Amino acid sequence: MPALEAAFARYGLKLRNDEERFGKLTLQEVLKHELTHLVIGVLQLARIDRQLPDAWLDTLALIRRVREPYDFRGDRAAANHLAAFAADLRVWLDERPASAATAAEVFAAASSVVDAAELRAFILGQDIGDEFDAIKAAIILRLEQSMQATSNWDDVLRAFLAVDAVPIMTCHRSKGLEYHTVIALALDGEQWWSYKGDPEEGKSTFFVGLSRAAHRVIFTSYSPVARHRLPDLYALLDAAGAEQTDWV
């Protein structure tokens, strides 16, 4: 990972390790969870000095879903509540730089946009096996990491989401996602050691990685004998008309 980070940094690019663990969850699981969307959405609305229609609509919709079984006052009441809450949270954040607050305090302040018991019930009802405390702990750990490098709240939110970074993950973790361009690292026998024992499973993994790319996929290898170790996979690429480039 450090070698990859250094290589990307030479071109002004950052990496986001979606396999990094925060307690029981990976970063990928943290970033896609609805509890994260709620907490970070509220913080964005409170802190970032520009209109964020997507964040507003997404956060408002989440609040309505959390409160719907208990509150029948409708969208206008929820919108007024969110606007007032974001204004109060902005004051709270302005009174303390990130270096003077704890991640647990920030989570508590942002998540209090809805009733704690209602929020817990909502999260537990979304997916079988979801553990509210584990998700909460993971978000706090990620916030803590993001708050270490800066006292500016805008930078904290950017660091948390790492939106400008290139995500790196295993093929299996990429299921259900789609990217413009996918780069598969090291298509050779050393990284694909399990292929020899179970070629069909290896092909399935290969196609999972291939199908994540909406427009372009690049398979790399540093081994001059990679073709001989994975002949079936390279034959598929050849049949598809894939171009080969020697970068050395």
Regions found by a protein language model. Name each.
Residues A79-N80, D88-R96, D188-V248:
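C-terminal accessory regions
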Residues L15, I168, Q244-T245:
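Conserved beta-strand scaffold positions in the cores of enzyme catalytic domains, especially
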Residues M1-A6, Y179-H180, R229:
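A short acidic (Asp/Glu
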Residues E144-G197, E201-R212, R216-P224:
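Conserved helicase core region in the C-terminal RecA-like lobe
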Residues V42, L62, D88, W92, ...:
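Residues that form generic nucleotide/phosphate-binding pockets
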Residues M1, F132, K136, G202-K203, ...:
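A structural signal for well-ordered alpha-helical scaffolds and beta->alpha junctions
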Residues M1-G125:
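ATPase/helicase motor core of nucleic-acid motors
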